[in-house]
C-alpha cells in the first residue's frame, strides 16, 4: 500500500515538474518572440534611415530624407519583413497563451474534453510550424536580396550619385539577416519541445504514425510558406519590376529578340507552375495530416486501411512532381546563365560591345537568386516521397500485424 501511494505521489510530482517546465518554456518563447519583433524592427529601421553624415555628404534635400524607405524596391523587402515578424510573432504568442491556459485548465482533463484538449495541441503545433516557416523564408528572401545588392545597381541609377547609399544599406541589412536566423531556429526548438510532449502522450503503437504525421504536416506547411513567397515575388515582379524593365530591341538581331521574348514568357510560366503546385500540395498534405490525427485519436483500423491506397496514390503524384521539379531547376539554371547566353549570341551576330537590355539582365539575375527556394521546393518533394513511403509501410504493419490488432478498433 505504501509503495502504491509513493508511486502515485511521485507521478504527481513528475507531472507538476513537467507542467512547470512547459510553462517556463512557453514564457521564454513569448519573451524571445517579443525581443525578435522589437529588436529587428529598430535595427532594420536604422539601416534604411539616413544619418546626418549621409545627408551632408550626399547633399540630401529635405524631401529626400526618406530616400531609402520611399524606394519601391527597398520598401518591398524591409517593410514585408517587419510586417511578417509582427503578424506571425503575434500569432505565436497567442498560441503560447492558448497552450498555457489549456495545460492549467483542469476541466479540460475530464472525459470528452480531454479529446478537445489534445486537438488544441495538434492544431497549435500545426500553426506554430506555419508561422515559423513563413518567418524563416521571409528572412531568407531578404538575405538573398540584400546580400546581392551589387547585382541590382541598375535599379538605383536614377538616384545619380546616391547609389552608394543603397549599397551600404544593403550590405548592413545583409549582416542583420544573417544573424536573425538565430531566432526562427529558437522558435523551431521550442516547437520541437511541444512535439515531444505530444509524442509521449500518444499510445506507444501509434508513435511512429505520429512522427510521420509531424513530418508530413511539416512538408505541407513548407509548401504553404513557399506559396506565400512565390505569390509575393510574382506580385513584386508584375507591379514593381515591370516599371524598371523598359528597353528597346530595335537595334538587335532576331535571334536575340527571340531569346529575350521567350525568357519573359518563361518567367510567367515559372511562377504559375510553382503557385499551382505549392498551393495544391499544401492543401492535400495538410488534409492528409489531419486524417492521420483522426486515425491516431480514434485508434481506427478502418482509417489505417483506407490510408494504405491513399499513400500509394500520393506517392505516384509526388513522384510525378519530382520529375516536374527537374524542369523548374532547369529553368532556374537557365536564368542564371542568361547573360552569358546573350553574350554568346551577341558575339555570333557581331553586335556592338554595348550591354544588351541591362534592365532585363538585372531582372533575370533577380530570378536566378530565387533558385534557393527552388532547391527548398525540390527537397520538400523528395522528403514527401520518403515520408509517404514510410506511412504506407507503417499503416500496413498496424493493420495486418497480430501484435497491434487488439489495440485498434
UniProtKB/Swiss-Prot annotation:
Keyword Cell membrane assigned:
yes
Question: Is the keyword Cytoplasm assigned to this protein?
Answer: no
Instruction: Outline which residue ranges sit on the Extracellular face.
Output: 41-83, 140-179, 231-272, 325-380
Membrane-crossing residues?
20-40, 84-104, 119-139, 180-200, 210-230, 273-293, 304-324, 381-401
Instruction: Cite the ranges annotated as topological domain Cytoplasmic.
Output: 1-19, 105-118, 201-209, 294-303, 402-409
The UniProt keywords, alphabetically, are: Cell membrane, Glycoprotein, Membrane, Transmembrane, Transmembrane helix
Q: Provide the glycosylation site positions.
A: 161, 178, 360, 380
Give the way it sits in the membrane: Multi-pass membrane protein
- Residue spans making up a coiled coil are none
Q: Where in the cell is it found?
A: Cell membrane
Organism of derivation = Plasmodium falciparum (isolate 3D7)
The source's domain of life comes to Eukaryota
Q: What does this protein do?
A: Orphan transporter. Required for parasite growth. Required for early gametocytogenesis.
GO annotation, cellular component aspect: plasma membrane
Mutant phenotype after disruption: Repeated attempts to generate a knockout failed. Conditional knockdown results in the arrest of parasite development at the trophozoite stage. Early arrest of gametocyte development.
Note the SS bond partners: none
Supply the name of the protein: Plasma membrane resident transporter 1
Amino acid at each position: 500500500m505504501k509503495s502504491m501511494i509513493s508511486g502515485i505521489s511521485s507521478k504527481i510530482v513528475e507531472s507538476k515538474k513537467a507542467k512547470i517546465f512547459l510553462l517556463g518554456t512557453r514564457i521564454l518563447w513569448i519573451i524571445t518572440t517579443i525581443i525578435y519583433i522589437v529588436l529587428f524592427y529598430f535595427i532594420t529601421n536604422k539601416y534604411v534611415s539616413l544619418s546626418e553624415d549621409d545627408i551632408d555628404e550626399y547633399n540630401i534635400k529635405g524631401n529626400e530624407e526618406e530616400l531609402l524607405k520611399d524606394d519601391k524596391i527597398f520598401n518591398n523587402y524591409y517593410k514585408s519583413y517587419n510586417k511578417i515578424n509582427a503578424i506571425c510573432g503575434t500569432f505565436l504568442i497567442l498560441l503560447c497563451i492558448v497552450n498555457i491556459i489549456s495545460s492549467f485548465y483542469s476541466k479540460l482533463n475530464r472525459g470528452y474534453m480531454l479529446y478537445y484538449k489534445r486537438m488544441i495541441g495538434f492544431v497549435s503545433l500545426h500553426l506554430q510550424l506555419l508561422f515559423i516557416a513563413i518567418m524563416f523564408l521571409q528572412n531568407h528572401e531578404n538575405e538573398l536580396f540584400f546580400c546581392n545588392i551589387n547585382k541590382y545597381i541598375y535599379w538605383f541609377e536614377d538616384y545619380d550619385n546616391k547609389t552608394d547609399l543603397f549599397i551600404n544599406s544593403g550590405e548592413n541589412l545583409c549582416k542583420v539577416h544573417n544573424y536573425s536566423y538565430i531566432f526562427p531556429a529558437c522558435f523551431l526548438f521550442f516547437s520541437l519541445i511541444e512535439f515531444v510532449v505530444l509524442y509521449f502522450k500518444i499510445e506507444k503503437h501509434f508513435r511512429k504514425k505520429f512522427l510521420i504525421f509531424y513530418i508530413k504536416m511539416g512538408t505541407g506547411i513548407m509548401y504553404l510558406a513557399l506559396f506565400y513567397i512565390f505569390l509575393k515575388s510574382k506580385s513584386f515582379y508584375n507591379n514593381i519590376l515591370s516599371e524598371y524593365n523598359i528597353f528597346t530591341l530595335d537595334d538587335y538581331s532576331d535571334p536575340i529578340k527571340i531569346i529575350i521574348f521567350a525568357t519573359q514568357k518563361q518567367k510567367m510560366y515559372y511562377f504559375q507552375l510553382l503557385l499551382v503546385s505549392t498551393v495544391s500540395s499544401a492543401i492535400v498534405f495538410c488534409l492528409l495530416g489531419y486524417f492521420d490525427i483522426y486515425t491516431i485519436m480514434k485508434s481506427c483500423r478502418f482509417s489505417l486501411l483506407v490510408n494504405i491506397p491513399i499513400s500509394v496514390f500520393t506517392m505516384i503524384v509526388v513522384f510525378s512532381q519530382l520529375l516536374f521539379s527537374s524542369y523548374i531547376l532547369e529553368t532556374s539554371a537557365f536564368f542564371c546563365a542568361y547573360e552569358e547566353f546573350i553574350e554568346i549570341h551577341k558575339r555570333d551576330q557581331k553586335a556592338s560591345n554595348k550591354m544588351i537590355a541591362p534592365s532585363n539582365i538585372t531582372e533575370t539575375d533577380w530570378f536566378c537568386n530565387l533558385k534557393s527556394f527552388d532547391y527548398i521546393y525540390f527537397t520538400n518533394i523528395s522528403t514527401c516521397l520518403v515520408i509517404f513511403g514510410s506511412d504506407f509501410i507503417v499503416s500496413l504493419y498496424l493493420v495486418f500485424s497480430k501484435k497491434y490488432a487488439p489495440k485498434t478498433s
